[in-house]
Amino acid sequence: MIITFFALSRLGYTVMMLSTRLSAVACDFLLNIASCDTVLYGQSRSVRTIMGELLRLRPVACRPIVQRSSLDEAEKSSSVFVLNRAQRPENQVDKPGIILHSSGSTGLPKPLFVSHGSTAKSFTRGNELSTFNPLPWFHAHGLNSAMQAMYKRKTAFMWNASLPLTTNGLTKALEAAQPEFFTTVPYALQLLVDDPRGISALRKCKSVSYGGAPCPDELGDRLQSERIRVGGAFGL
């Protein structure tokens, strides 16, 4: 997915990131507003089911995302592909670079058009720390934190989307990655503070941040009492 995202952007396409939790009706609604006629999708059973339902709602070209095994088997080449852009970068600043969307918790999701200029500003303002964010890239908080780390040439650790978020799994991942900066949603922080090992792993981070939802007072007080350096991120 990561390679596909960068490849499409490099080729000049505006990429819309759809949540795997959306219904076919919600996907159809967003595709219509964005005038999108092609969908690249993952290989999980739930995603394939949604794609089948989507095809019954609208004619759209569907292409599976290239899997890692296919890339490993690809013929290696020392040649470098030079992309000649038809548009000058300065003329693209105000045009959409990425399309995200709201959760749709109160109805159909709303598209969020993010310009190239806004994207560049957001991606380049990182804190120069290795980062772990278990949120997927269709979540603005997950996308921004990963890109900010990459731009600063720091490691961006990500979660395996095929695995559920659990206290044990998240604690083990945090212990293995040992990031300087851990950022996620309050729900994941609650999972970690429920385990002494999770609290210990959070203490080792230089900074811990949450976004995407307000942090409950009880959780915030607990993090502070455990001497975890935590703060909130707003406006992503």
Question: What is each of the regions a protein language model found here?
Answer:
Residues 12, 105, 153, 212:
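Conserved G/P- and acidic residue-centered "switch" motifs that form tight phosphate/ATP-binding loops
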Residues 1-5, 9-40, 110-113, 133, ...:
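Short beta-strand->loop structural element characteristic of the AMP-binding/adenylate-forming
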Residues 44-96, 108:
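ANL superfamily adenylate-forming
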Residues 179-183, 193-236:
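Gly/Ser/Thr-rich phosphate-binding loop
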Residues 88-124:
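Conserved AMP-binding A3 loop
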Residues 20-53, 73-79, 118-132, 165-180:
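Conserved ATP-dependent adenylate/AMP-binding module captured primarily in the ANL superfamily
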Residues 8, 96, 102-105, 131, ...:
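Conserved S/T- and glycine-rich ATP-binding loop of Class I adenylate-forming
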Residues 119-130, 138-183, 188-191, 195:
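Conserved AMP-binding/adenylation subdomain of ANL enzymes
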